[in-house]
């Protein structure tokens, strides 16, 4: 992948600099700062990066390593050719809509925290969302973020902003509720009302001014009413500049294994283009797995490969283990 446009994957939790605190000292050209990318001023028009034919295409990766999620059910095969759209692999701005589930399951104290104590999924999700937003902002200050919370219905909590502090100010004063269902169609309708989708004359050659991405953090019991896909949702999902990433936090119990796998399979089936990422994490497992999933979502959706082709070890022959995964 072209290092001049590739986004980095390291989480950062530091506060963004205030106006007046910015320095003009040029950093050396390193892997984390290729060609002094972070030292260039912010421009209003997305940079157009030309790439040779087929460069960085996921379909040309040989012998890919498996993904490092809890079970291999999220390694979905690449989609059929009719949906394999080739879009410019550029680092254009993102409009990221983070949807946080507020069902009562998120308050269950079952996750194993870093110090060995028990934590709930809501607190862990709040921390990883803040780290994600701050890190994406450092990668490209043109990125914008919005926060949506989901009870029985989705509610727009924070409008699009490029200031991480505005998002984080709304993030922690949240409480879980008993929820009877999850209105996925309502979530898509809300996003369609609040977001304008980009359009270009040529999808394959002209970079979009921005892309739209939903990151859904979902934790509902498998006993709730089945999720459904409508025609309007299909149209949104087939847009080449729209991405729907999912982190599914399930109870991990063996007796309900088939049920939560069905839900995870439904989310996987929504990705007709093969460009979205889906992860499942057990609510009884380590919180590190949850943070690892969010760290992998730092990659720009136009630049990342199919999820089944993604590898996170430094060497091809190196076997991945929980200790070697991305930590935050």
Swiss-Prot record:
InterPro entries: BABAM1, vWFA_dom_sf. Residues 64-74 have a biased composition (Low complexity). Residues 96-297 are annotated as: VWFA-like. Gene3D superfamilies: von Willebrand factor, type A domain. Keywords: Cell cycle, Cell division, Chromatin regulator, Cytoplasm, DNA damage, DNA repair, Mitosis, Nucleus, Ubl conjugation pathway. One of its GO terms (cellular component) is nuclear body. GO terms for biological process: cell division; DNA repair-dependent chromatin remodeling; double-strand break repair; mitotic G2 DNA damage checkpoint signaling; positive regulation of DNA repair; response to ionizing radiation. Its main location: cytoplasm. Residues 1-13 have a biased composition (Polar residues). It comes from the Eukaryota. Residues 1-84 are annotated as: Disordered. It is found in: Cytoplasm; Nucleus. Component of the ARISC complex, at least composed of uimc1/rap80, abraxas1, brcc3/brcc36, BABAM2 and babam1/nba1. Component of the BRCA1-A complex, at least composed of brca1, bard1, uimc1/rap80, abraxas1, brcc3/brcc36, BABAM2 and babam1/nba1. In the BRCA1-A complex, interacts directly with abraxas1 and BABAM2. Component of the BRISC complex, at least composed of abraxas2, brcc3/brcc36, babam2 and babam1/nba1. Belongs to the BABAM1 family. Component of the BRCA1-A complex, a complex that specifically recognizes 'Lys-63'-linked ubiquitinated histones H2A and H2AX at DNA lesions sites, leading to target the BRCA1-BARD1 heterodimer to sites of DNA damage at double-strand breaks (DSBs). The BRCA1-A complex also possesses deubiquitinase activity that specifically removes 'Lys-63'-linked ubiquitin on histones H2A and H2AX. In the BRCA1-A complex, it is required for the complex integrity and its localization at DSBs. PANTHER family: BRISC AND BRCA1-A COMPLEX MEMBER 1. The VWFA-like region is similar to the VWFA domain. Its presence reveals similarities between the structure of the 19S proteasome and the BRCA1-A complexes. This is BRISC and BRCA1-A complex member 1. It comes from Xenopus laevis. The gene is babam1.
